[in-house]
Swiss-Prot record:
This is Succinate--CoA ligase [ADP-forming] subunit beta. Pathway: Carbohydrate metabolism; tricarboxylic acid cycle; succinate from succinyl-CoA (ligase route): step 1/1. One of its GO terms (biological process) is succinyl-CoA metabolic process. The lineage of its organism: Bacteria, Pseudomonadati, Pseudomonadota, Alphaproteobacteria, Rickettsiales. One of its GO terms (molecular function) is magnesium ion binding.
Length: 386
């Protein structure tokens, strides 16, 4: 789960991280009133969307008067902001964060992430912070340093010293950086975050460090422990189909292809998407119905897939362990009778009650294309949509 910048800063401040502060606007009629509350010489108007690259896309504006700030805010509110992370459709700006500007001496990059390959928490830092960190990673990766934290021992003083040293901080600034590292680590662990990113972390002209922008992504599996964080979720920033799927207990991610997939198990789902690509087509989604899906959940899964207008065919790939193939078959038939399936449907079943499931589908009278293995299923669905 992602949250907005102003929410991320609120969390970081609770853990002792110094951040820039401002006011949030959620309605156009509140823009002037909100800006009037800020007494500053420089105003920074920031679009609040769940995507990076706002600065380059015009979603962050720095102005030097109240009048300019009001005009920029009114112009920015409600637009579709297109960045390299939103895709061509962009993301509608429904919130603004308006801050007081500050003097910047130098910008740095600092983040903490759970490294799944190394099975540990990893700090990532660079002396080249700001909007071009992606370019730094591509062209000059040697300017980016990493420190891994052994989960058995946790954060140690040498991690904090090492990060401060690699960023070139000395004396009081090194002390400040060590405290920021410690605070960010505590926030990361205690909130079950998947990533915390501060970009840029700046040195002000007075020598103090400040988090000028912040992003936090949380592990969805840990949200049940944090109702206060769950309450920060902005459904307007999420795909409606993904939200609908989550409410039904389904794992769904929309993609750009034209073949809808319904599978049980994340690994099998990824293998299914891979083989669709191998046979020359593209998956329209990732959809894992889970191991304990019932007839209604299967029915809802198919409805969600068919809600995507780009879907030209559906591949159902089920390996029945806990999940019974006859339940899948009944769900498919129920969905077909309820909403009608007007695109080619290929079904591959294996495992528990597979013969019963195949019999149910065969006797349904529906135009269902059976497949005996995954390669056969992928080949048949790709051929069916051509």
């Amino acid at each position: 789960m992602n949250i907005h910048e102003y929410q991320a800063k609120e969390i970081l401040r609770k853990y002792g991280v110094p951040t820039s502060t401002g006011l949030v606007v959620t309605k156009t009629e509140k823009i002037n009133e909100t800006i009037d509350k800020l007494n500053t010489e420089v105003y920074v108007v920031k679009a609040q969307i769940h995507a990076g690259g706002r600065g380059k896309a015009g979603g962050v504006k720095v102005v030097k008067s109240k009048e300019e700030a009001k005009k920029v805010a009114h112009d920015m509110f409600g637009i579709n902001l297109v960045t390299h992370q939103t895709g061509p459709q962009g993301q509608k700006v429904n919130r603004l964060y308006i801050e007081s500007g500050c003097d910047i001496l130098k910008e740095y990059y600092f983040s903490i992430v759970f490294d799944r390959l190394a099975s540990c928490i990893t700090f990532i830092a660079s002396t080249e912070g700001g909007v071009d960190i992606e370019e730094v990673a591509e062209k000059t990766p040697e300017k980016i340093v990493k420190f891994s934290v052994d989960p058995a021992t946790g954060l140690q003083d040498f991690h904090m010293r090492g990060i401060a040293y690699e960023l070139g901080f000395k004396d009081n600034q090194a002390k400040q950086m060590k405290e920021i590292v410690k605070s960010v680590y505590n926030a990361f662990v205690e909130t079950d975050a998947a990533q915390i990113e501060i970009n840029p972390l700046i040195v002000q002209t007075d020598g103090n460090l400040l988090a000028l922008d912040a992003k936090i992504t949380f592990d969805d599996n840990g949200l049940f422990k944090h109702p206060n964080i769950t309450a920060m979720r902005d459904h307007d920033e999420e795909d409606p189909l993904e939200t609908r799927a989550a409410n039904a207990g389904l794992s769904y991610v929309k993609m750009d292809g034209n073949i809808g997939c319904m599978v049980n198990g994340a690994g099998l789902a990824m293998a299914t998407m891979d083989i669709i690509k191998l046979y020359g087509a593209s998956p329209a989604n990732f959809l894992d119905v889970g191991g304990g899906a019932d007839r209604e959940r299967v029915k809802e899964a198919l409805k969600i897939i068919l809600s995507d207008k780009e879907v030209q065919g559906i591949l159902v790939n089920i390996f029945g362990g806990i999940m019974r193939c006859d339940i899948i078959a009944e769900g498919i038939i129920a969905a077909a009778k309820d909403i009608g399936i007007k695109v080619p449907l290929v079904v591959r079943l294996a495992g528990t009650n597979v013969e019963k499931g195949k019999e149910i589908l065969s006797n349904s009278g529906l135009e269902i294309i059976p497949a005996h293995d995954l390669a056969d299923a992928a080949n048949k669905i790709v051929e069916a949509i051509r």
